[in-house]
């Protein structure tokens, strides 16, 4: 009976699969007929589209080769970008004229974008897999997921009456999603119906609209149309092949002094999780820089408004200059309050990619090497990385109670303070709250909940992490409960941050797609388990020396010492707040067994709290 039941179930499943496959082929056949698709592309074609992108006048030139080659150039009012895809491999010239070779998820997505362009120009061919078929939510459409060779799946919504695509949907890097809508279908010069209006609705950008200005069939394929991209002039100036930059560690973030357009140096956060560079919009007037365009960023938390800047020059110690840069702009006031130091912006891919970067955490030195002359002389652990829009990824393996070899596609995030933060979908899919959770109370950074970097996490311990030849054990980790931002996405498993990297001497070798780890004595020491005095602090005021208690954990040592939310710490052991930084205050609060005297302003009155610092493993407010 059991065998018969199994056979019946299997037969039903096979019948269902066959029916779905037949349905998809019928939908595709109707789609081809509706757009008058031809068996083979008649020739190479060239589109010119005009519209607006990030509130900027924009022209896109798109070339499609009959043999599958693809090229697209996007010219906005103040910047441009170009991609060439040949033989399944790609090149990308960014807004600074730097040419790179995409790989990993980014390459897969570019292959799918080129495939989508061919589908719209010539109709759907047979060179893809139909991964899924379902009915649209309103019942008037069918939804097909089409995946080309080496690409990722795009969802296409097909109208059941016209059999034309209504829209397509793709997931982008770090969980961003874009829906593209198609309208005004009419005949092209080569006979196929094409959409003359395209609307792009991106999850973290201003909606964009493009209309076809010209669609041309090219009789012959000019070699220049798909030639390799040529980089612009180098944007790096170095007085020698090696430069040494000092840095400080602020709340486990590397902060480097940088001069912007010749102005006095200010701290910039070093962040591999940033795809370009960023300027603090709140300080741009002091740099003499104006923004252009309009977009949004979400980072690990809430979405906030953003824009762009151009003609930016970054000056570093030891004679290093990065010139003629385009950057994003964003309000970094929240970062300043969290770190307690003035922040000019963020240094991401557009800085990191120009060098091989050596990080000596013990000496707090960053050594920049010329990638054309540098070669690795050591025997460290080499871990390969891939990139998605300039963000590096590892392929890690985890050991958890039910799976000793769980794969994890993780961001190599040197801008993250913690050890590992797992995304909410990865936590749910692998039952991590139950399997490795140590404190399931979800905590947020009180006072900064609406910032782009805001997170909502509970805590756990991973028994083992394997990163190439590196093995780390008993690692305290964060388990995200975010429903938005990067940690709310299921595109990657999580981020690995500074708590792990700072145990090593590190080389970031972007030109060779690798990060090298040299062991130090710290790498052999057990991880410190999470303990806290029970206070959350931010730095307020123009000088960032007004230290405000934003939360006190219930039943914590801080609560027992009579600290309260909204307290202002005006002095420590008789030293006024103007004489020390937020990092100094945090260091004192981590010195278990030390006696401290805090002067507190509460309700306009001063009072003293004398206490011995005790750390506990309870909730972190």
Residue ranges and their predicted role:
Residues 1-5:
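Positively charged n-region of N-terminal signal peptides that target proteins for export
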Residues 7-16:
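Bacterial N-terminal signal peptides
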Residues 17-21:
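Sec/Tat signal peptide C-region and signal peptidase I cleavage site
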Residues 22-29, 89-154, 160-162, 172-176, ...:
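Flexible, processing/modification-adjacent segments and terminal tails
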Residues 25-98, 126:
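N-terminal mature ectodomain segment of secretory-pathway/periplasmic proteins
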Residues 41-48, 66-72, 138-145, 163-167, ...:
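Short, hydrophobic/aromatic-rich segments at coil-to-beta transitions
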Residues 51-52, 73-76, 94-97, 146-149, ...:
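Beta-turn initiation residues at beta-strand->coil junctions
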Residues 123, 157-161, 169, 183-621:
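Pepsin/retropepsin-fold aspartyl endopeptidases
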